[in-house]
Amino acid sequence: MAPARAGFCPLLLLLLLGLWVAEIPVSAKPKGMTSSQWFKIQHMQPSPQACNSAMKNINKHTKRCKDLNTFLHEPFSSVAATCQTPKIACKNGDKNCHQSHGAVSLTMCKLTSGKHPNCRYKEKRQNKSYVVACKPPQKKDSQQFHLVPVHLDRVL
């Protein structure tokens, strides 16, 4: 009976570790970074770049291949200005989202294959409106804006 129990404990520990790792969201903000700084890294790209190279900068922080990501080809100041449009409901029900005035150039990157750090993406360039969640800037953020984007809620 003892040998069966000895084999059970490592399996249980492995299962618990797997469940714990599965709970870490891919979009979790890296330590030492504000939500707005992480938003800039994940979604701001004034000049379009190929997804395979652009996503390396995101994936190096998360240590995994992010499934889907959208880059807005706008200056940060333009996206921050979106935070001044009327509030609308976010997908999660919060009321701190704001819709862009019009369509902007963007690139959607979708994971096709690979394991970190060799993630491969398919890209799709589009012109669409977007919705961002905004919050007051934190101490480490630029205080230039009353509200700053912290989450890309959806593309319309």
From Swiss-Prot:
Q: Which InterPro entries match?
A: RNaseA, RNaseA-like_dom_sf, RNaseA_AS, RNaseA_domain
User: Can you name this protein?
Assistant: Ribonuclease 7
What organism does the UniProt record list as the source? Homo sapiens (Human)
Q: Which PROSITE patterns match?
A: RNASE_PANCREATIC (PS00127)
- What does the record give as the active site? H43 (proton acceptor), H151 (proton donor)
Q: Which domain of life is it from?
A: Eukaryota
Class in the EC hierarchy, top level: hydrolase
Q: Which residues bind dUMP?
A: H43, K66, N69, T70, H151, R154
Region Important for antibacterial activity: which residues?
A: 29-32, 139-140
- Sequence similarity: Belongs to the pancreatic ribonuclease family.
- Tell me which PANTHER family the record gives: RIBONUCLEASE, RIBONUCLEASE 7
Task: Indicate where this protein resides in the cell.
Answer: Secreted
A GO CC term? extracellular space
Cell membrane found in the keyword field: no
Impact after mutating K29A: Slight loss of bactericidal activity. No effect on catalytic activity
Outcome reported for the amino acid change (mutating H151A): Loss of catalytic activity. No effect on bactericidal activity
Q: What is its EC number?
A: 3.1.27.-
Keyword Oxidoreductase among record annotations:
no
User: GO biological process: what's one of them?
Assistant: defense response to Gram-positive bacterium
